[in-house]
């Protein structure tokens, strides 16, 4: 992070990681149904790991907008506690409160494992979108102060979440469906349509474009594609760094992104919004 001039990164706890793997088609998926309590136990262990990482590496933990601003001003790497998939809830909203007390401020509702919140893009349709429990989860997230992330959610689930949301939503890592800049990709199911993206923008939120592109310049083109659909106030970077290294192999290379955006035609103000300003605005509105 220091080498890449990154002030803040979302450090994801992935509760369904113990049951994920490649299926016979080579696609990442849940390979079995988790045992009761298994993903909750794993989630708690990952929160312990984050605590140790923060202490051992001298990182800051950002739990408020003021913390993000201080991290940027000081140039000291900070992390936002993030959970990628609320599979560990198992119908228990009090576990959200526990996660908040442990420093988590960013939650993604679904991932690769069926849960009781809603449908995900790479799985079968079982809920026809957002469930009644999912509605309660969104309301609780707003009350507690979490960034609400609808990455991996189906278009139907996303549009139903938009109707419930009273704060900006984030879709943290994707690309525009049929992106010419990305070209042929095994990630087609994870791309989003123009209507899908516009629904997020209507909440005041943003769509994060991951960097799974052939080159850095193509990545900038991918950012432009989404800006053309929803406007520069509703686009941000979304790394999924360990899973999709793409055009930027590690965090140290992110120092080159802003220069590439300027070279590609973005103004300094526009580049600032995409590189962090839009996420900061959403974080402030959601977390405080």
Q: How should each PLM-predicted stretch be described?
A:
Residues 1-125, 177-181, 186-288:
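N-terminal hydrophobic targeting/anchoring segments and the immediately downstream early-domain regions
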Residues 126-161:
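Loop-centered beta-sheet repeat module
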Residues 168-174:
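Short hydrophobic/aromatic-enriched beta-strand-loop microsegments
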């Amino acid at each position: 992070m220091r080498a890449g001039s990154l002030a803040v990164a979302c450090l994801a706890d992935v509760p369904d990681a113990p049951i994920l793997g490649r299926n016979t088609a080579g696609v990442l998926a849940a390979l079995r149904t988790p045992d009761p309590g298994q993903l909750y136990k794993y989630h708690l262990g990952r929160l312990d790991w984050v605590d140790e990482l923060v202490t051992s590496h001298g990182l800051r933990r950002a739990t408020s907008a003021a913390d993000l601003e201080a991290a940027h001003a000081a140039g000291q790497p900070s992390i936002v506690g993030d959970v990628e998939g609320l599979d560990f809830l198992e119908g228990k909203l009090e576990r959200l409160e526990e996660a908040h007390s442990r420093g988590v401020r960013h939650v993604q509702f679904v991932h690769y494992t069926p849960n009781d919140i809603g449908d995900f893009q790479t799985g079968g349709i079982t809920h026809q979108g957002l469930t009644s429990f999912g509605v309660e989860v969104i309301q609780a997230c707003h009350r507690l102060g979490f960034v609400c992330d609808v990455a991996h959610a189906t278009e139907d689930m996303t549009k139903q979440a938009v109707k419930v949301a009273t704060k900006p939503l984030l879709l943290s890592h994707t690309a525009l469906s049929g992106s010419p800049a990305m070209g042929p990709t095994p990630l087609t199911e994870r791309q989003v349509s123009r209507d899908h993206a516009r629904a997020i923008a209507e909440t005041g939120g943003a769509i994060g474009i991951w960097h799974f592109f052939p080159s850095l310049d193509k990545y900038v083109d991918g950012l432009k594609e989404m800006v053309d659909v929803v406007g520069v106030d509703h686009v941000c970077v979304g790394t999924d760094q360990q899973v999709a290294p793409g055009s930027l192999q590690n965090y140290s290379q992110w120092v080159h992104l802003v220069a590439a955006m300027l070279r590609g035609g973005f103004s300094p103000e526009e580049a600032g919004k995409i590189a962090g300003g839009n996420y900061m605005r959403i974080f402030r509105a959601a977390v405080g």
